[in-house]
Every structure is written in C-alpha cells, then in structure tokens.
Amino acid sequence: MSKVSIYLNFQGNTEEAFNFYKSVFNTEFVTPVMKLKDAPLQPGAPQLSEKDLNSVMHVALPILGGTVIMGTDMLESMGHKVVVGNNTTINLECDTREEAHKLFSAISAGGSDIAPLSSSSGVFGAVA
C-alpha cells in the first residue's frame, strides 16, 4: 500500500527534536539515528567540522496510524539554509515505480526538480 510520510528539516537540532517526538508519541526510531560521520564522503563535498559530522543525516520515527516523520540537519556549511518553504517535505512512498513516475511527472509540471527521479533507494525524486 502506498504511504505518505513527512520530512522535517532542522538547522542543527534534529536529534533533540526527534527525541522529544519519541517521548510524546511513546515510540522508537525505525533505525538508529544516522549521522553525517557514518556516511561516505561524497567527491567535492566540503570539509566538515566535528560538530557538523555529528549532525543528523537521517532519522525516522513512526507516529500515528503508520505515519512516519523523518528529519535531517540542513547545514549552512554544506550550502543549505532552513527557510520557510524548505523546512517541511511531504514524501509519497509509492507501491510501484510506474506510480512513482506518474505522480512525479504530474506534480513536477511547472515546478522545479530539486532531485530528478532516480533509483538511489528504490526510486527517489524531489520537487519544489
């Protein structure tokens, strides 16, 4: 069954926020909190401070009725700045690639692709 999840972007306090949500919803993270230091360094990526390396790359927490909230730290040192409009994302988790392509094409018409649909983890894309 297709699902919708919510992605929240923070500027350095994702782990604190998600530990709070975890206590409110009395639930556990889907997987351990993933830190930037746990990911391979991408070619051309800026050198990060120890503080930035300890930032959250990804966290996922089930809340109500199967809804999952996910989050990340958006770091200015990596060229990201949290502003109204990029601090929340709605994710469509489709059952099939065909459904993902159909919805992505329809939603992206007239928008700006942040990340074209690709097969990074199943299939992924982002539209603004």
Each language-model region and where it sits:
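A structural signal for short, well-ordered beta-strand segments
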Residues: 6-8, 88-90
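Core segments of cupin and vicinal oxygen chelate
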Residues: 8-66
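A generic structural signal for ordered alpha-helices
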Residues: 11, 39, 78-81, 85
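Short, solvent-exposed loop/turn segments at the edges of secondary structure
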Residues: 56, 85-87
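Vicinal oxygen chelate
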Residues: 2, 22, 31-34, 60, ...
